[in-house]
A protein has these predicted regions:
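Positively charged n-region of N-terminal signal peptides that target proteins for export
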Residues: 1-5
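Hydrophobic membrane-insertion alpha-helices, especially the h-region
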Residues: 7-23
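Aromatic-capped interface at the extracytoplasmic side
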Residues: 18-34
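A residue-level signal for beta-strand positions that form part of recognition/binding surfaces
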Residues: 27, 48, 74, 104, ...
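N-terminal secretory signal peptides
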Residues: 31-82
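Mature, soluble, non-transmembrane domains
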Residues: 77, 88-177
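Covalent nucleotidyltransferase core used to form phosphodiester bonds in nucleic acids
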Residues: 85
Length: 177
């Protein structure tokens, strides 16, 4: 009898621990403004996120390397790679360490922090995300002009937002649309 009770208590504790981990450990979420869930996986500090697109003015490829921050509350822009100078692309020494790599200009050591990211698909921009090695070709999934939001959030908070339409956590603090 005592062995059964011990086994049941152990299983209950194990189930509780698994549920607690699921509800508390943050997710990296990618959603469209239409409400489509495009990606949701457990986030971890240092999780790589790459944004690839064709610059709308220069018509050349741009790649931005980010990571999930140590607090699991947002993103850190580490580096940008591009082929030609253009509007919105970094070039000042104060923005990081600038170098050339073949046909590319590379700005590293940027360390810019963002609580969340809002991107838009565009005509010919081929917006693509690489999330922890998984490629998401958003330009093939969404109409041009669609907003795409990336954020890190605890599953219970994300569930509350979906159920009640109220924002919680970093997204609310940052004024997410």
């Amino acid at each position: 009898m005592t062995k059964r009770l011990g086994a049941r208590l152990f299983l209950a504790a194990l189930l509780f621990a698994a549920l607690a981990d699921f509800l508390v450990r943050p997710l990296l979420v990618v959603e469209s403004e239409q409400g489509a869930l495009l990606y949701a996986e457990k986030a971890y500090a240092g999780m790589p996120v790459t944004i690839r697109f064709i610059h709308s003015v220069q018509k050349t490829p741009v790649e931005e390397d980010l990571r999930v921050d140590e607090e699991l509350s947002g993103f850190v822009l580490e580096a940008t790679r591009y082929q030609s100078f253009g509007v919105g692309l970094p070039f000042l020494a104060s923005e990081g360490e600038f170098r050339t790599e073949g046909d590319y200009f590379v700005m590293e050591g940027m360390e810019r922090r963002f609580p969340q990211l809002s991107l838009r698909t565009g005509v010919g921009t081929e917006l693509t995300l690489v999330l922890d090695g998984t490629e998401e070709r958003l330009f093939e999934k969404l109409p041009a002009g669609s907003r795409v939001d990336l954020y890190v959030i605890a599953p219970w908070r994300w569930g509350m937002e979906k159920l009640f339409g109220t924002e919680y956590g970093a997204a609310a603090a940052a004024g997410k649309e």
